[in-house]
Structures are given as structure tokens and as C-alpha cells.
Amino acid sequence: MRGACKFLAGLPALPDKRAGKRGQNNKPMRIYLVVMDETQEAQTALRFASVRARETGGSVHILALVPRQSFNAFGGVQATIEREALERAEVMANAAAGNIFAESGRMPVIAVRPGSPQEVIRKYLEDHGDIAALVLGAAANGSPGPLVTHFAQHAGSLPCPVYVIPGSLTNPQVDAIAARGV
């Protein structure tokens, strides 16, 4: 058995398929995926991810979701409603990205995707194997929200950890937690 260990020790390491891009000190860049909407808890999650990315030499991906409309209007009206929802999501994601850039000097990756939120997020994680963590914000009061509930229940089947950031935290509290790591 010792000979086998010695033999294996002499082999070059296989490349890590999840290693992805390299950041500071040639370490794998940690990418934090934040699902953005117009809620305060999403803003809190984004703040956590941007501070954490700054501290780790990583980056942020912003995923803005455009849920399918639950009603069907006449063809042209339906297309207009869907286009307006897409434009609102793009404006919101770009505004959030601008805030991150203003604070950190690093521009996050922005993606706007239509569809079922859970399916879109799972597909994004599948397509971006270098995501280090999915960062979601929980509502300060009441239910944590459908995405937090869903992904907390299915955390064991995800390719990365899920960070749930309490919506009741103040900005200084979020900054302190993100700066020291979790």
C-alpha cells in the first residue's frame, strides 16, 4: 500500500473543474450569486455578497428574474406586459450593479432571465459551475419568502452552499458579518 501512495503522490494533480477564474494570489475566484428583486431583503443579500466578494477577491453575479405572467392577455398586450417586466428587471439589476461598482470598483455580472424562479436559479447554477454560494435574503418579518423556503429545503441537492441573510440586519451588521466570513 505504501508504494501505491508514493506512486499517487508523484502524479500531477488533476485540474479542478469547479476552479473557474483566478483571483488574488492565483486562488480560485469565489463567485457569489445574488437573486435580485425590488425587496429590501434582496438589497441586504446583495450587500453581503459584495462585501464578501471584496474580502475574498471574488465577484458577484446578479440574477434578476422575470416570472412568467399568470394570466393571458391578447397577443400584443401580453407581449407588451412581458417586455415591460423584462425592462424593469434590467433597470433594477443595472442599478444594483452600479451601486456595487461605485462601492467596490468591480462590475458584477448581470443576467436577466424569464421563467420559473426556482428553475431559472437551478439552471444558472448548473451553467455556472464556479459559483461558490447562492446568497438569498430572508424577509425581516413573517415568512422568509418562497425562494429561501425552497432552496433551504433543497440545499442538499445544490452544487454550492446557500447563504440566507436575515433582512433585519443593519448595513453595519451585514458588513461586519461579511467581512469576517461565515
Residue ranges and their predicted role:
Residues A45, N72-G75, R122-K123, G145-L147, ...:
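Short, well-ordered secondary-structure micro-motifs
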Residues A102-V109:
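A short helix-to-beta-strand connector/capping loop
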